[in-house]
């Protein structure tokens, strides 16, 4: 390739803390095998004048290695770092960025800075791999942490946001150069720029190359760029070179968001408690009761960060691969049997066999040994981050956190005297009427009606069929010739077509009892009988509304939900009659972002949020979701992936649970769950 004088070669693997095995087993492999091998290889084949191999990892792995390696291993690592042979980048892990709180993200970024101080370096580059997109709210924290360059390597089957390959992502006076790749890492050369970037990636958790593979990689790249200096490099070095042409790069000021964010709805038990701990961390840090010098602070925050890390269990394909048992009876029988075999593949999985042969050989000792209990154990391990986080806190904070966790166990509330739905009640200054599903069907304050045609707190249960899952797969995914063998099993539900009586249906909940005690109204609702017995609808739920002068607190709790493998979702709808619904914004990482301001190919349908905020001439409304971050804009958009921006006329649908993901996510839920929302309304006086 003419005109290129220098080629930066980046050696990486992709860290999944799980997926290829149990998370702890994966981390052990880095401590015992991958990092020592990378260091030994670099020390063997590099010279100060000519670096052939530099291994780049997220800062978490270096920090973890420092805490678990032997003294001899640490001595070698220190030497490799001093020589520039082993290097971290500015982010600790690949995360679902929107799920992090500002405090968790601050800890994430602090890991690199702590290493920088220890070794006298200055990290300016960061990378995330696999997850296709992130929120623009990341720009300011990156910039403030000194990160100037972010590489995003997209999963090879996932939709790529329609942005320039390299651009300046700008928000509120801060910017970072973003480099997008349609793979984990692709070569890039920019017209008029005489340096190029090449990645030498190994597969997930596979560790570094050997010496022969390094030589072959360098020879391949040298042949591609005759006359150029080709050598191992770092993301920092490439980022520093890019600064020369920063002013030539296009500027993007729109949200991208995460088209994998629906995964955070797969384990409401874990996410609910994670959000509660994040809220406590915010409170403690603000008050000074917790500081970065508090014993246990780093490990507490690290465990919270690992919940937001993008890997949530073991790979369904390698460790379960049950594509046949869909009905509740068959699914329950399969769980009792526990072990699975490759006989549970269907004709839809024929192309998966080749992928499995590679995976079984490289990750599973050459044989398949599927098990429901083992697959479920990987999700229990992920929930273990909650317990591990609590264990690191000082006693007083730990007791406070444990009390908060205990309060999240739903308790059926039988209080109150019966009141009538469909008639207007005055409660704490509000005029309110309740509908036949327990929702608020009418809400007025100071003579202004905020809910007339909308609804607040409408609970719905939805099941999806093979047409939904297949259409979504072909709308969202790409490069089927190369990725289809494994991607359909990850992103769709192959075999679901054999559940021939399944039809896409949205089920309502029916009001069973409406009671009032003081300023609190309790709506007890019952799930549809067919939805509960055939699928996984909760049999009973309660919506508990507590009215204050300028706020309505809404608690949703459900009971008696069966585990179910059929694709399903639970939604709670909040629709207001505001004068200009286009003025709704979402709060992510403490920053307000419009749902209308999302690039094509980004996530225009769903987001993980802290709050929804409306400000118009008629007044202000905020909906704070304390435990359920996942929200769908304008409709129930779990499988609707048409890439259109949604109208906000119908409000927002909080997704309380879904099992859309395959891959490594939890795919069934039988927990009793609880979610709190706080609605604050201020009506503006009118002429």
Residue locations for each model-derived region?
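Catalytic-domain carbohydrate-binding cleft regions of carbohydrate-active enzymes
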Residues: 1-367, 374, 518-687
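Catalytic and substrate-binding regions of extracellular carbohydrate-active enzymes
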Residues: 298, 306-309, 316-560, 673
């Amino acid at each position: 390739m003419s005109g290129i004088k220098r080629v930066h070669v980046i050696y990486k693997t992709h860290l999944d803390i799980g997926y290829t095995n149990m998370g702890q087993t994966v981390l052990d492999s880095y401590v015992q095998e991958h990092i020592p091998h990378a260091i030994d290889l670099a020390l063997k084949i590099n010279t100060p004048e000519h670096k052939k191999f530099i291994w780049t990892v997220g800062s978490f792995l270096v920090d973890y290695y420092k805490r678990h390696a032997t003294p001899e291993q640490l001595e070698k690592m220190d030497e490799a770092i001093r020589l520039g042979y082993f290097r971290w980048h500015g982010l600790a892990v690949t995360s679902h960025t929107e799920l992090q709180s500002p405090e968790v993200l601050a800890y994430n970024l602090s890991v690199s800075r702590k290493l920088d101080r220890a070794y006298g370096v200055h990290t300016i580059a960061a990378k995330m791999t696999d997850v296709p997109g992130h929120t623009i709210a990341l720009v300011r924290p990156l910039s403030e942490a000194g990160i100037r360059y972010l590489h995003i390597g997209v999963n090879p089957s996932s939709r790529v946001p329609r942005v320039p390959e390299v651009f300046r992502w700008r928000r509120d006076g801060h910017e970072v150069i973003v480099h997008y790749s349609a793979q984990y890492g692709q070569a890039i050369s920019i017209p008029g720029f005489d340096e190029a970037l090449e990645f030498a990636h190994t597969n997930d958790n596979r560790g570094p190359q050997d010496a022969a593979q390094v030589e072959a990689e360098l020879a391949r790249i040298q042949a591609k760029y005759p006359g150029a200096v080709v050598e191992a490099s770092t993301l920092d070095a490439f980022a520093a070179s890019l600064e020369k042409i920063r002013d030539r790069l296009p500027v993007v000021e729109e949200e991208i968001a995460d088209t994998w964010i629906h995964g955070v709805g797969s384990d409401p038990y874990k996410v609910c408690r994670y959000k509660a701990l994040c809220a406590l961390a915010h409170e403690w840090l603000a008050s000074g009761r917790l500081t970065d010098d508090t014993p246990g602070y780093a490990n507490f925050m690290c465990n919270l960060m690992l919940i937001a890390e993008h890997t949530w269990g073991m790979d369904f394909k390698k460790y379960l691969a049950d594509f046949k048992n869909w009905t509740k009876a068959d699914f329950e029988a399969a769980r009792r049997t526990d072990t699975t075999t490759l006989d549970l593949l269907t004709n839809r999985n024929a192309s998966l066999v080749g992928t499995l042969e590679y995976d079984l050989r490289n990750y599973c000792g050459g044989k398949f040994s599927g098990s429901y209990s083992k697959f479920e154990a990987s999700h229990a391990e992920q929930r273990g981050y909650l317990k591990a986080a609590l264990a690191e806190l000082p006693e007083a904070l730990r007791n406070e956190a444990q009390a908060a966790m205990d309060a999240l166990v739903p308790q059926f509330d039988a209080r109150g005297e019966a009141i009538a739905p469909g008639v207007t009640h005055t409660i704490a200054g509000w005029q309110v009427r309740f509908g036949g599903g327990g929702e608020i069907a009418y809400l007025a304050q100071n003579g202004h009606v905020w809910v007339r045609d909308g609804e607040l707190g409408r609970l719905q249960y939805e099941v999806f069929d093979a047409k939904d899952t297949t259409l979504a797969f072909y709308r969202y995914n790409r490069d089927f010739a190369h990725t289809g063998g494994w991607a359909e099993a990850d992103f769709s539900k192959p075999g679901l077509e054999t559940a021939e009586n399944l039809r896409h249906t949205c089920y309502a909940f029916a009001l069973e009892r409406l009671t009032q005690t003081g300023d609190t109204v309790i709506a007890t609702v019952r799930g549809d009988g067919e939805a509960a017995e055939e699928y996984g609808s909760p049999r009973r739920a309660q919506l508990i509304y507590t009215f204050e002068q300028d706020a309505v607190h809404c608690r949703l709790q459900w009971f008696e939900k069966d585990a179910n493998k059929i694709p399903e979702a639970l939604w709670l709808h909040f629709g207001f009659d505001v004068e200009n619904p286009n003025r709704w914004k979402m709060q992510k990482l403490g920053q307000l972002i419009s749902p209308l301001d999302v690039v094509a190919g980004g996530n225009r349908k769903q987001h993980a949020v802290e709050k929804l905020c409306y400000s118009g001439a008629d007044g202000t409304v905020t909906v704070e979701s304390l435990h359920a971050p996942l929200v769908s804009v304008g409709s129930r958009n779990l499988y609707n992936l048409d890439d259109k921006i949604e109208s906000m006329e119908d409000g927002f649908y909080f997704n309380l649970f879904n099992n859309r993901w395959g891959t490594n996510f939890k795919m069934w839920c039988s927990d009793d769950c609880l979610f709190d929302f706080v609605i604050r309304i201020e009506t503006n006086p009118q002429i």
